[in-house]
């Protein structure tokens, strides 16, 4: 508990485990738009956010649940859906006239081949400029969902569905 005159109470969002203020300060000082990737068990959310003195402004966003509009019926929380959501986000942002940003993964652990980097690969493949190293991207087999098709054996058409959804997304924005 806060006892004594020298005890410093952390900011509320830091206490809740929601904000890393040291990283946020570095991102704000760069004065570049942030590409914010957040994942949950069921979805992946991507936003293009610009910092202002009044508060952050969201310019563009995509959520993996939007993939249903393009015929994707698979699980929206996996690596395949993360890539497709990144692709959708990148094409939406380019259509609105934005060209790039820097990646912000917040308090999520950075591990190569994760859903965060699958989303980043989709963003980069769309032509949206985000500085990154290709070494962190998951393999193309994982992005297409071949590991899921191999595991499920009998009824997984995920790689074919991935290609069809990818073509529909490109068709809408070309």
From Swiss-Prot:
Disulfide bonds: none annotated. GO terms for biological process: ribosomal large subunit assembly; translation. Signal peptide: none annotated. One of its GO terms (cellular component) is cytosolic large ribosomal subunit. The keyword Ribosomal protein applies. Keywords: Ribonucleoprotein, Ribosomal protein, RNA-binding, rRNA-binding. InterPro entries: Rbsml_uL18_euk (IPR005485). CDD domains: Ribosomal_L18_L5e. One of its GO terms (molecular function) is 5S rRNA binding. SUPFAM superfamilies: Translational machinery components. NCBIfam families: PRK08569.1 (NF006342). Part of the 50S ribosomal subunit. Contacts the 5S and 23S rRNAs. This is one of the proteins that bind and probably mediate the attachment of the 5S RNA into the large ribosomal subunit, where it forms part of the central protuberance. Belongs to the universal ribosomal protein uL18 family. This is Large ribosomal subunit protein uL18. It comes from Methanosarcina barkeri (strain Fusaro / DSM 804).
């Amino acid at each position: 508990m806060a006892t004594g005159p020298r005890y410093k109470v952390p900011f509320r969002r830091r206490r809740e485990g929601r904000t890393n203020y040291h990283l946020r300060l570095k991102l704000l000082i760069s004065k570049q738009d942030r590409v914010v990737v957040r994942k949950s068990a069921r979805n992946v959310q991507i936003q293009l956010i610009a910092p202002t003195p009044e508060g952050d402004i969201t310019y563009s966003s995509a959520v993996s649940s939007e993939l249903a509009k393009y015929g994707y019926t698979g699980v929206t929380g996996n690596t395949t859906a993360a890539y497709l959501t990144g692709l959708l986000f990148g094409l939406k942002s380019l259509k609105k006239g934005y060209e790039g940003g820097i990646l912000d993964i917040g308090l999520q652990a950075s591990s190569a081949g994760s859903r965060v980097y699958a989303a980043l690969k989709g963003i980069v493949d769309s032509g949206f400029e985000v500085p990154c190293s290709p070494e962190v991207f998951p393999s193309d087999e994982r992005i297409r969902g071949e590991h899921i098709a191999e595991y499920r054996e009998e009824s997984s058409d995920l790689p074919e569905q991935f290609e069809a959804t990818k073509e529909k997304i490109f068709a809408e924005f070309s």
